[in-house]
């Protein structure tokens, strides 16, 4: 825009001055000379007359031998074809001079623009501008040289640094929070595991104590039932076998199915034998003691750990020396 303005001004000045001056000069140089009708006696060229004057001599298109007086320029009167030729020459010269001056003014304008903006190529002008700004203002950065304000560039840089710091703080906080959560989860898991183990241990101990208590209570109830209820031989055998097996499990002894069946048959047979002996001697104790010993020996054959318990059970069921006899359904 600056180049166009300056070029217009230069062109106007140079064109106006040159055109005005040259035109004025041409007008003065090629001004139409005065045409005088030449009159002479009897001579004419169709546009005027050619006459003879005794004082000025013969007036014609071509000055002849009649020389004007000394100190006086001959008058040049042109007309007809010669006048048109003069006009053509004058106009051609003026056009040629105007074209030359116009071309010169254009060259001057282009040269002036090149000097001001540094060439016609945009790339060259841009490079020249950058080099000039870098040399003239070395303290500015490229953004500021391109037109960005220093305050705006500083604010932008500060905002970017602030965003980086905030992002770093967020990442650090997330990492710390994740670490704290992991530590809390580990502590909670450890507490739950320890509590579970302790609860399991206490529960197992309590269950064992309760089982033993229930077994003792069950044995007492069975003993009471056997002592106060008349049972058949089969029922008595079943109760004795149940208590015997429970006791064997408590002591860690395990019997096979065949051993259990054999033991049950022997107990059943011994109870039948006790029933027969009781009928023979209702209040006798020797038969009861012998039967108890036989059952004890029989249980010992199946499991040695049940011998003492079986003896105690028989001693509790069949009161030795009691006058009421055996509390079974063998009474008649």
From Swiss-Prot:
Localization, UniProt: Virion
**Keyword set, alphabetical order:** Capsid protein, Viral genome ejection through host cell envelope, Viral penetration into host cytoplasm, Virion, Virus entry into host cell
Q: Which residues form a coiled coil?
A: none
Q: Pfam families from the entry?
A: Microvir_H (PF04687)
Which domain of life, per UniProt?
Answer: Viruses
Supply the InterPro entries for this chain. Answer: Microvir_H
Q: A cellular component term (GO) from this record?
A: viral capsid
Q: Does the keyword Lipoprotein apply?
A: no
Q: Which GO terms describe its biological process?
A: symbiont entry into host cell
Q: What does this protein do?
A: Minor spike component of the viral shell. Involved in the ejection of the phage DNA in the host and is injected with the DNA in the periplasmic space of the host. Involved in the determination of the phage host-range.
**Beyond the main fields, what else does the record say?**
Phi KhT, a host-range mutant of phi K, can grow on E.coli C and B, besides K12, and is more thermosensitive than the parental phage phi K.
**How is the subunit organization of this protein annotated in UniProt?**
The virion is composed of 60 copies each of the F, G, and J proteins, and 12 copies of the H protein. There are 12 spikes which are each composed of 5 G and one H proteins.
Q: What name does this protein carry?
A: Minor spike protein
Q: What is the primary gene name for this protein?
A: H
